[in-house]
Regions:
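Structured catalytic core of nucleotide-sugar glycosyltransferases
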Residues: 1-130
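A ubiquitous structural signal for well-ordered alpha-helices
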Residues: 21-24, 28, 53, 108, ...
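Conserved amphipathic alpha-helical interaction elements at protein-protein interfaces in regulatory
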Residues: 27, 31, 56, 60, ...
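Acceptor/aglycone-binding surface of glycosyltransferases and processive sugar-polymer synthases
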Residues: 63, 67-71, 75-85, 90, ...
Length: 269
Protein backbone atom coordinates (compact mmCIF):
# COMPACT_ATOMS: atom_id res chain seq x y z
CA UNK A 1 0.00 0.00 0.00
CA UNK A 2 1.37 3.42 -0.98
CA UNK A 3 2.07 6.18 1.51
CA UNK A 4 -0.42 9.04 1.49
CA UNK A 5 1.12 12.50 1.14
CA UNK A 6 -1.11 15.43 2.06
CA UNK A 7 -0.20 18.86 0.70
CA UNK A 8 -1.57 21.89 2.55
CA UNK A 9 -1.77 25.07 0.46
CA UNK A 10 -2.90 28.26 2.28
CA UNK A 11 -4.17 30.84 -0.22
CA UNK A 12 -5.07 34.50 0.00
CA UNK A 13 -5.96 36.25 -3.27
CA UNK A 14 -4.12 33.66 -5.37
CA UNK A 15 -6.60 33.32 -8.25
CA UNK A 16 -3.84 34.05 -10.78
CA UNK A 17 -1.14 31.84 -9.30
CA UNK A 18 -3.23 28.86 -8.20
CA UNK A 19 -3.91 27.33 -11.67
CA UNK A 20 -0.20 27.55 -12.52
CA UNK A 21 0.72 26.00 -9.19
CA UNK A 22 -1.68 23.09 -9.71
CA UNK A 23 -0.29 22.53 -13.20
CA UNK A 24 3.25 22.25 -11.83
CA UNK A 25 2.08 20.10 -8.92
CA UNK A 26 0.33 17.71 -11.32
CA UNK A 27 3.70 17.08 -12.94
CA UNK A 28 5.36 16.35 -9.59
CA UNK A 29 2.54 13.99 -8.59
CA UNK A 30 2.90 12.13 -11.90
CA UNK A 31 6.61 11.59 -11.21
CA UNK A 32 5.90 10.34 -7.68
CA UNK A 33 3.64 7.49 -8.78
CA UNK A 34 4.91 5.43 -5.84
CA UNK A 35 2.80 7.55 -3.44
CA UNK A 36 -0.83 8.63 -3.19
CA UNK A 37 -1.74 12.28 -2.79
CA UNK A 38 -4.27 14.50 -1.09
CA UNK A 39 -4.23 18.28 -1.60
CA UNK A 40 -5.92 20.56 0.93
CA UNK A 41 -6.48 24.08 -0.42
CA UNK A 42 -7.30 26.67 2.25
CA UNK A 43 -9.03 29.87 1.17
CA UNK A 44 -8.07 32.48 3.76
CA UNK A 45 -10.96 34.86 3.13
CA UNK A 46 -9.73 35.88 -0.32
CA UNK A 47 -11.33 38.92 -1.96
CA UNK A 48 -10.68 37.83 -5.52
CA UNK A 49 -11.87 34.67 -7.31
CA UNK A 50 -9.62 32.27 -5.42
CA UNK A 51 -12.55 30.27 -4.03
CA UNK A 52 -14.14 29.90 -7.47
CA UNK A 53 -10.82 28.69 -8.86
CA UNK A 54 -10.52 26.17 -6.02
CA UNK A 55 -13.99 24.80 -6.70
CA UNK A 56 -13.24 24.40 -10.41
CA UNK A 57 -9.95 22.65 -9.70
CA UNK A 58 -11.51 20.31 -7.12
CA UNK A 59 -14.19 19.23 -9.61
CA UNK A 60 -11.59 17.90 -12.04
CA UNK A 61 -9.23 16.34 -9.49
CA UNK A 62 -10.74 13.99 -6.90
CA UNK A 63 -7.64 14.12 -4.68
CA UNK A 64 -8.12 17.86 -4.08
CA UNK A 65 -10.41 19.31 -1.42
CA UNK A 66 -10.76 22.84 -0.16
CA UNK A 67 -11.56 24.69 3.05
CA UNK A 68 -12.86 28.26 3.01
CA UNK A 69 -12.70 30.75 5.88
CA UNK A 70 -15.48 33.27 6.56
CA UNK A 71 -12.87 36.06 6.57
CA UNK A 72 -9.13 36.60 6.42
CA UNK A 73 -7.57 35.04 9.52
CA UNK A 74 -3.96 35.03 8.31
CA UNK A 75 -1.55 32.46 6.95
CA UNK A 76 -0.85 30.88 10.34
CA UNK A 77 -4.54 30.04 10.77
CA UNK A 78 -4.63 28.74 7.21
CA UNK A 79 -1.72 26.38 7.81
CA UNK A 80 -3.18 25.12 11.08
CA UNK A 81 -6.59 24.48 9.51
CA UNK A 82 -4.97 22.65 6.62
CA UNK A 83 -2.99 20.43 8.99
CA UNK A 84 -6.16 19.48 10.86
CA UNK A 85 -7.78 18.37 7.58
CA UNK A 86 -4.71 16.51 6.31
CA UNK A 87 -5.03 12.72 6.53
CA UNK A 88 -1.63 11.78 5.11
CA UNK A 89 1.15 9.67 6.55
CA UNK A 90 3.30 12.62 5.50
CA UNK A 91 2.15 16.22 5.26
CA UNK A 92 3.67 19.05 3.24
CA UNK A 93 3.04 22.79 3.47
CA UNK A 94 3.45 24.72 0.22
CA UNK A 95 2.67 28.22 -1.04
CA UNK A 96 0.74 28.69 -4.27
CA UNK A 97 3.06 31.39 -5.64
CA UNK A 98 5.76 28.87 -6.70
CA UNK A 99 8.46 30.78 -4.81
CA UNK A 100 9.30 27.44 -3.19
CA UNK A 101 10.35 24.88 -5.86
CA UNK A 102 7.69 22.11 -5.76
CA UNK A 103 10.18 19.65 -7.25
CA UNK A 104 11.91 19.60 -3.85
CA UNK A 105 9.03 17.43 -2.70
CA UNK A 106 10.74 14.43 -4.31
CA UNK A 107 13.96 14.94 -2.34
CA UNK A 108 12.00 15.70 0.83
CA UNK A 109 10.14 12.41 0.57
CA UNK A 110 13.43 10.56 0.18
CA UNK A 111 14.77 12.31 3.28
CA UNK A 112 11.86 11.42 5.56
CA UNK A 113 11.38 7.85 4.30
CA UNK A 114 14.94 6.65 3.67
CA UNK A 115 17.37 8.97 5.46
CA UNK A 116 15.90 8.91 8.96
CA UNK A 117 14.59 12.48 9.11
CA UNK A 118 11.26 13.48 10.61
CA UNK A 119 11.04 16.62 8.50
CA UNK A 120 12.66 18.02 5.37
CA UNK A 121 12.40 21.78 4.91
CA UNK A 122 13.41 24.42 2.37
CA UNK A 123 15.82 27.18 3.32
CA UNK A 124 16.37 30.27 1.19
CA UNK A 125 20.03 31.33 1.07
CA UNK A 126 19.62 34.49 -1.04
CA UNK A 127 17.03 37.26 -1.13
CA UNK A 128 17.51 38.38 -4.71
CA UNK A 129 14.59 40.49 -5.90
CA UNK A 130 13.52 41.63 -2.44
CA UNK A 131 13.58 45.32 -1.42
CA UNK A 132 16.86 46.06 0.45
CA UNK A 133 15.05 47.35 3.55
CA UNK A 134 13.05 44.13 3.81
CA UNK A 135 16.17 41.99 3.45
CA UNK A 136 17.95 44.06 6.12
CA UNK A 137 15.19 43.67 8.69
CA UNK A 138 14.87 39.96 7.90
CA UNK A 139 18.57 39.44 8.67
CA UNK A 140 18.24 41.47 11.87
CA UNK A 141 15.24 39.40 12.94
CA UNK A 142 17.08 36.10 12.59
CA UNK A 143 20.10 37.50 14.46
CA UNK A 144 17.88 38.68 17.31
CA UNK A 145 16.08 35.35 17.48
CA UNK A 146 19.41 33.54 17.55
CA UNK A 147 20.58 35.56 20.55
CA UNK A 148 17.33 35.93 22.47
CA UNK A 149 15.66 32.54 22.03
CA UNK A 150 16.62 29.01 22.99
CA UNK A 151 14.45 27.73 20.12
CA UNK A 152 16.28 27.44 16.82
CA UNK A 153 14.83 29.54 14.01
CA UNK A 154 17.01 28.90 10.97
CA UNK A 155 17.92 31.93 8.87
CA UNK A 156 15.98 31.82 5.61
CA UNK A 157 13.70 29.00 6.76
CA UNK A 158 10.53 28.66 4.74
CA UNK A 159 7.17 27.16 5.62
CA UNK A 160 7.65 24.73 2.72
CA UNK A 161 8.43 21.36 4.27
CA UNK A 162 7.40 17.71 4.40
CA UNK A 163 6.75 16.21 7.84
CA UNK A 164 5.97 12.74 9.10
CA UNK A 165 2.82 12.10 11.08
CA UNK A 166 4.38 12.32 14.56
CA UNK A 167 5.84 15.74 13.67
CA UNK A 168 2.42 16.94 12.48
CA UNK A 169 0.65 15.58 15.56
CA UNK A 170 3.12 17.42 17.79
CA UNK A 171 2.30 20.68 15.98
CA UNK A 172 -1.43 20.08 16.30
CA UNK A 173 -1.05 19.53 20.04
CA UNK A 174 0.23 23.11 20.30
CA UNK A 175 -3.03 25.02 20.51
CA UNK A 176 -1.73 28.58 20.73
CA UNK A 177 -4.06 31.28 19.43
CA UNK A 178 -1.30 33.51 18.03
CA UNK A 179 0.89 30.97 16.28
CA UNK A 180 4.42 31.49 15.02
CA UNK A 181 5.07 28.35 13.02
CA UNK A 182 8.71 29.07 12.21
CA UNK A 183 9.41 28.90 15.93
CA UNK A 184 7.06 26.00 16.57
CA UNK A 185 8.75 23.88 13.90
CA UNK A 186 11.96 24.15 15.92
CA UNK A 187 10.35 24.00 19.35
CA UNK A 188 8.70 20.58 18.86
CA UNK A 189 12.12 19.11 18.14
CA UNK A 190 12.65 16.13 15.83
CA UNK A 191 15.30 15.72 13.17
CA UNK A 192 15.11 18.11 10.21
CA UNK A 193 17.01 18.12 6.93
CA UNK A 194 17.47 21.52 5.29
CA UNK A 195 17.43 21.93 1.52
CA UNK A 196 19.02 25.21 0.43
CA UNK A 197 18.03 27.17 -2.67
CA UNK A 198 18.28 30.65 -4.15
CA UNK A 199 15.33 33.01 -4.05
CA UNK A 200 12.66 32.56 -6.72
CA UNK A 201 10.19 35.33 -7.52
CA UNK A 202 6.47 34.59 -7.38
CA UNK A 203 4.89 33.34 -10.61
CA UNK A 204 1.88 35.69 -10.51
CA UNK A 205 0.14 38.24 -8.35
CA UNK A 206 1.70 40.28 -5.57
CA UNK A 207 2.96 39.42 -2.12
CA UNK A 208 0.41 39.86 0.65
CA UNK A 209 3.10 40.70 3.20
CA UNK A 210 3.91 44.38 3.54
CA UNK A 211 6.56 45.86 5.81
CA UNK A 212 4.26 46.42 8.78
CA UNK A 213 2.66 42.99 8.65
CA UNK A 214 6.12 41.39 8.57
CA UNK A 215 7.26 43.67 11.42
CA UNK A 216 4.26 42.66 13.53
CA UNK A 217 4.83 38.99 12.70
CA UNK A 218 8.48 39.32 13.79
CA UNK A 219 7.52 40.93 17.10
CA UNK A 220 5.03 38.14 17.75
CA UNK A 221 7.76 35.59 17.08
CA UNK A 222 10.23 37.26 19.43
CA UNK A 223 7.65 37.59 22.21
CA UNK A 224 6.43 34.01 21.77
CA UNK A 225 9.83 32.31 21.78
CA UNK A 226 12.00 34.48 24.00
CA UNK A 227 11.85 35.45 27.67
CA UNK A 228 14.11 38.46 27.06
CA UNK A 229 11.24 40.96 26.49
CA UNK A 230 9.57 39.76 29.70
CA UNK A 231 12.81 40.00 31.69
CA UNK A 232 13.48 43.47 30.28
CA UNK A 233 9.95 44.65 31.10
CA UNK A 234 10.27 43.24 34.63
CA UNK A 235 13.60 45.03 35.12
CA UNK A 236 12.14 48.34 33.94
CA UNK A 237 9.15 47.86 36.23
CA UNK A 238 11.36 47.18 39.25
CA UNK A 239 13.56 50.17 38.40
CA UNK A 240 10.59 52.53 38.31
CA UNK A 241 9.25 51.04 41.54
CA UNK A 242 12.59 51.73 43.22
CA UNK A 243 12.66 55.31 41.90
CA UNK A 244 9.10 55.87 43.10
CA UNK A 245 9.96 54.42 46.53
CA UNK A 246 12.95 56.75 46.91
CA UNK A 247 10.84 59.72 45.79
CA UNK A 248 8.15 58.91 48.36
CA UNK A 249 10.76 58.72 51.12
CA UNK A 250 12.18 62.13 50.23
CA UNK A 251 8.65 63.53 50.07
CA UNK A 252 7.63 62.18 53.49
CA UNK A 253 10.87 62.78 55.41
CA UNK A 254 10.19 66.51 56.05
CA UNK A 255 6.90 65.57 57.70
CA UNK A 256 8.30 62.68 59.70
CA UNK A 257 11.49 64.52 60.75
CA UNK A 258 10.82 68.23 61.52
CA UNK A 259 14.53 69.06 61.62
CA UNK A 260 15.15 67.48 58.20
CA UNK A 261 15.22 70.82 56.26
CA UNK A 262 17.80 72.31 58.65
CA UNK A 263 19.87 69.18 58.36
CA UNK A 264 19.86 69.58 54.57
CA UNK A 265 20.85 73.26 54.90
CA UNK A 266 23.68 72.40 57.30
CA UNK A 267 24.86 69.67 54.99
CA UNK A 268 24.85 72.09 52.07
CA UNK A 269 26.82 74.75 54.00
Amino acid sequence: MNDLISIVVPCYNESEALPKFIEVLDGIIAKMDYADFQVVLVNDGSRDKTLEVMKAIAQTRPYIKYVSFSRNFGKEAGMYAGLTYADGDYVAIMDADLQDPPEFLIDMYEAVTKEGYDCAAARRVTRKGEPPIRSFFARMFYKLMGRMSTTEVVDGARDFRLMNRKFVDALLNCREYNRFSKGMFGWVGFKTKWIAYENVERVAGQTKWNFWSLFKYSIEGIVAFSTTPLVFASFIGLLFCFIAFVAVIFYLLPYLTPSFPSILVSATI
